[in-house]
Amino acid sequence: MPGHLLQEEMTPSYTTTTTITAPPSGSLQNGREKVKTVPLYLEEDIRPEMKEDIYDPTYQDEEGPPPKLEYVWRNIILMALLHVGALYGITLVPSCKLYTCLFAFVYYVISIEGIGAGVHRLWSHRTYKARLPLRIFLIIANTMAFQNDVYEWARDHRAHHKFSETHADPHNSRRGFFFSHVGWLLVRKHPAVKEKGGKLDMSDLKAEKLVMFQRRYYKPGILLMCFILPTLVPWYCWGETFLNSFYVATLLRYAVVLNATWLVNSAAHLYGYRPYDKNIDPRQNALVSLGSMGEGFHNYHHAFPYDYSASEYRWHINFTTFFIDCMAALGLAYDRKRVSKATVLARIKRTGDGSHKSG
């Protein structure tokens, strides 16, 4: 395994955590130290079966004017209607029953975990493994979130990591806050996104029947889980008004989930410190982490995309890590990959911006 030693830390018999330890600085040959030069994007990866989310600094944008934007008017209209409906939903919150507000919040949390613990840390990055009951829960939660099916989301996200801040990055933050937040969903993909994304190895997800099942039945799935169910449950179960159910539990909740996720692509790439790698754009943003339940420690995540915690500090403003650890305690999650403290400190010293408390 290039550049790393693996140690298996056994907690209970059903739970393992793979810890990444820093490699030796060189190897001895004929009594002398032979220094090996290893590209940074290969030096710190620990998954021999997974390279598609590792940053490739050799890729550069082609020179020349960017292609003309092609607006997707269907998406523009639907997003506008959603957010107008969500704003109206805010005015209805005071008239909602307490159960409706609690239901909307729980639905929000489950949806966020379908993104953070599900399509992001499990399926996009393979930072841990999940047994079938947990995978079923996460695929349902991901469908509730309605942010494209797991296969498409993971393909775009792997391209985002591998070709970060280039035209092959689906939500390139160097094209501005609005584009990286939501604008990328309102226009046709840049040709480089299609070209490079189409060449990524997605065989792991193609081989997973659950992921392909969701993709096959995604449209009826989102209609049921994202819109029909959250509207009918408050209305039918505790007599909430239909308008409150639709505008608060459905539209407002859905809009909040979307924007909490989008802020990881926009704000967490533009605002904050870069204690782990000052040479990349992603930042540490605690407010983003609060809304996304752990995805805002973005400089760390792009430096170590294979760490299941997506943060140096595990449970600190990181409910998703807490959730995964709880699932591990129940025997539903295992092989959680974790970067060792020594490796983190070495990276801070080598490429950090000096803002880390370790100095």
UniProtKB/Swiss-Prot annotation:
Topology term for the membrane: Multi-pass membrane protein
Skewed-composition ranges (Low complexity): 11-27
GO CC annotation: endoplasmic reticulum membrane
GO molecular-function term, one example from the UniProt record: metal ion binding
Keyword Ligase belongs to the record: no
Motif (Histidine box-3) on chain: 298-302
Binding site for substrate: 75, 148, 155-156, 188-189, 262
Transmembrane intervals: 73-93, 98-118, 218-237, 242-263
CDD domains according to UniProt: Delta9-FADS-like
PANTHER family (alphabetical): ACYL-COA DESATURASE, ACYL-COA DESATURASE 3
Protein name per the record: Acyl-CoA desaturase 3
